A protein has these predicted regions:
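Compositionally biased, intrinsically disordered linkers/stalks adjacent to structured regions
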Residues: 154-177
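A structural "domain/chain start" motif
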Residues: 3, 24-68, 72, 79, ...
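Bacterial N-terminal signal peptides that target proteins for export
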Residues: 2-13
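Bacterial N-terminal signal peptides
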Residues: 12-25
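Second-shell loop/turn segments in exported
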Residues: 52-59, 148-156
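Surface-exposed short loop/turn segments
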Residues: 34, 76-81, 88-133, 141-152, ...
């Protein structure tokens, strides 16, 4: 009799554990520290084309700097495989603006500060959810002292602007903030 009760107890514990495991598997909560809202069961790749520099003022390393920074952003903050073409998510575009503008005038009637602006046009295609496709223009600027040569501050300012634009693109495409 004791053996029969022991078997029922073990059977009951096994059944309860199986039921709990099934219930918890069905009710999963997904959380990402990067803020992405990617369904990795459906979306596995992102293609990021080179962004050619079509701006009037051309800084030759800019195209490569931006394209690589955007790829690096997706590599570091998602589990997506970054490929050159035909991804589940696809980013294409071009650098449409790279310009300097005097910002403020000093007492000697010369520019005291200069604004450097970077503008990039992006076309996003989501082959899994086409209703999320968009085309959008992104822009960032940095201000520097007009006494400085652009060649002395250009790479530092570009790194800041590229990171800002890459963050905006990332948020609009996979984080949806």
């Amino acid at each position: 009799m004791a053996l029969m009760n022991k078997k029922r107890l073990l059977y009951g514990i096994f059944l309860t554990a199986l039921l709990c495991t099934t219930a918890f598997k069905a009710c999963t909560i997904s959380y990402s520290f990067t803020g992405t809202s990617i369904d990795y069961t459906r979306i596995r790749t992102v293609s990021i084309a080179d962004f050619p520099n079509m701006a009037e003022f051309v800084y030759s390393p800019l195209s490569n700097m931006f394209s690589e920074a955007l790829r690096d952003k997706f590599l570091r903050q998602t589990r997506l495989e970054v490929i050159r073409a035909d991804g589940d998510l696809d980013l294409q575009g071009e650098i449409t603006g790279y310009e300097m503008m005097p910002l403020s005038i000093g007492p000697d009637a010369l520019a005291a500060q200069t604004r450097l602006t970077l503008t990039i046009n992006v076309r996003f295609t989501n082959r899994v959810n086409p209703e999320e496709d968009f085309e959008k223009r992104y822009s960032a600027f940095q201000v520097f002292d007009a006494n400085q040569l652009l060649s002395d501050v250009q790479d530092t300012l570009l790194d800041i602007m590229i990171e800002e634009i890459a963050d905006q693109i990332f948020n609009d495409t996979v984080a949806r903030w």
